[in-house]
Every structure is written in structure tokens, then in C-alpha cells.
Regions:
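Active-site environment of divalent metal-dependent phosphoester hydrolases
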Residues: 70, 100-102, 124
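Conserved, mostly hydrophobic/aromatic
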Residues: 25, 62, 84, 107, ...
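Glycine-rich beta-to-alpha transition loops that act as phosphate-gripper elements at the mouths
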Residues: 5, 27-29, 75, 91-101, ...
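Conserved anion-binding
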Residues: 1-70
Length: 138
């Protein structure tokens, strides 16, 4: 398995036990499969299967990026994100595709979502920091 060559499960498990609730795990996925090497290579590992393997390690949170949506402002892949957040034993941070404040509102309604990373929509002026702050603290 390609991903395990870069981060063997025993290493992740050991790190989580040595630093309980201090490890955030980034899951970068494309079409339901984990991607590695800066998104240059797709693995044959299904994201949800991998998550099931590591779920009880004591990971503090997941940062889930849908590569197909990152930087596109086409809205996050809420369907796949919901599957990940429901399967996860820890809170999930969404990354990839935020286009408007409506995406933030929708993300807040999902189970087990701790946050959402907003990049290009702020940079391009589609979401103002003031508008974002109002929604976060609403």
C-alpha cells in the first residue's frame, strides 16, 4: 500500500500513543482514494477503509481535503465529507472548495465537523473576513 510506505500504521499508532490527543491526521483524497506525495500519486487505499484502520489510535482531529475541489470554489464535497465525519472517532476539519458563506453554513450542520479551511474564496474577495467572523460566532 503506497500510503503505508510513507507513514506506516505502526508509526502513526506509536506517535498517537506517545502524544495522546496531539496528532492531527491529514487525509488528502481524490475520488474516494487517498493521495500522497503532494497529491502527485493516488494510492489504492480507500479513504474510509484507512480511517477505519486508524480510528482507535487516538488521533485528535482529521483534516480532510477533497483534492478535486481544492482551489476550485465549487463548494466542498459535502457527500464524501459527511461519510468521513460520520466514520471518524475524532472531529473533522474540511478543506477544499469553499465558495461562499453558504458553504460555511452547510458545513456547520454536518455531524462531527470542527472547522473548515477557507482560502481562495477569501483571497478572491468572495467571502470577507467580517462576514466569516459573523458566521463563525453566530
Amino acid at each position: 500500500m503506497l500510503y503505508q510506505l510513507l507513514c506506516p500504521l505502526h508509526f502513526l499508532n506509536e506517535a498517537c500513543h506517545k502524544f495522546p490527543n496531539k496528532i492531527a491526521l491529514g487525509l488528502d483524497a481524490k475520488d474516494g482514494y487517498l493521495s500522497v506525495s503532494g497529491w502527485k500519486e493516488n494510492s489504492n487505499q480507500l479513504t474510509l477503509d484507512y480511517l477505519k484502520e486508524v480510528n482507535d489510535y487516538g488521533i485528535s482531529r482529521l483534516i480532510y481535503t477533497d483534492i478535486n475541489r481544492d482551489g476550485t470554489k465549487q463548494s466542498p464535497n459535502f457527500e464524501e465529507t459527511a461519510k468521513v465525519s460520520e466514520a471518524s472517532n475524532c472531529p473533522v476539519i474540511i478543506s477544499g472548495g469553499v465558495s461562499s458563506i453558504d458553504d460555511i453554513k452547510k458545513a456547520k450542520k454536518l455531524k462531527n465537523i470542527e472547522g473548515i479551511i477557507v482560502g481562495k474564496a477569501i483571497y478572491d474577495g468572495d467571502i470577507s473576513l467580517e462576514e466569516l467572523a459573523k458566521e463563525i460566532y453566530a
